[in-house]
Amino acid sequence: MRKVLGVLMLISAITVEAQVNGEDRLGSWHMYFGTNRISNKFSIHSEAQLRYYEQAKNFNQLLLRAGLNYHIDANAWTTFGYGYIVTDGSFEEFPEETNSIEHRIFERFFLKNKVWEFNFEHRYTLEQRFLDFRDRTDVQHRMRYRLQMTVPLTNTFFLNFYDEIFINLQEDIFGQNRLYAALGINVTENLNLQLGYLKNHFSEAHYDRLQVAVTYNPDLRGVLKKKK
């Protein structure tokens, strides 16, 4: 009987914790990504994301990112950029609650390769994170690796999968892991839409998120040449 009560108490505690931190809610991420080619070697990366604990409500995070890409060749490029992130770290709303602010410097290296009809992309990231929690500040460093696979179904439709691991370069080495699957639509040569599902794992919490992403990659080289 004691064992049964113990199990029931454990289940109850887990359920309450999931309700408090929002693990039991299906959240949503609304995202825009852009790469504007300005020369044979350089392009500009732009990005905006709105993340919610629930479906388009209960704000979690605003992420704005921009960077300069240097294209080594068609299958390799680097990025140096800056990110501005506003985060509400609590699922519940509290009186006089303040959001944290992060200024992030990041460096990335991309490699692409193809195996049969499968298109692979390897993304390596280093981040220098300057965090302001209002009552204290902190500087943290992080490393990320993402393996992405894109599978064309037709000229219009494709599947996209990735797994990304976050490694902290200080205490608590494991940061998080993201596992993603999506159906994509090529609207034009430079514009695509994706509707996906993300499993976001932390050491003490696991979240499920729907993702809606718009990617627009216009080539501005012709426009810039005309202006000259």
Question: How would you describe each model-predicted region?
Answer:
Residues 48-54, 82-88, 113-115, 126-130, ...:
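Transmembrane beta-strands of outer-membrane beta-barrel pores
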Residues 161, 173-228:
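Predominantly the C-terminal beta-signal and adjacent terminal strand-loop region
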Residues 41-46, 75-80, 116-120, 155-159, ...:
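Repeated loop/turn-to-beta-strand initiation elements of outer-membrane beta-barrel proteins
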Residues 19-79:
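Start-of-domain marker
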Residues 26-28, 60-62, 101-105, 139-143, ...:
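Residues that define the transmembrane beta-barrel architecture of outer-membrane proteins
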Residues 32-36, 66-70, 107-111, 145-151, ...:
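Residues on the lipid-exposed face of transmembrane beta-strands in outer-membrane beta-barrel proteins
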Residues 1-22:
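Bacterial Sec-dependent N-terminal signal peptides
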Residues 19-23, 52-57, 92-100, 132-137, ...:
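Outer-membrane beta-barrel domain signature
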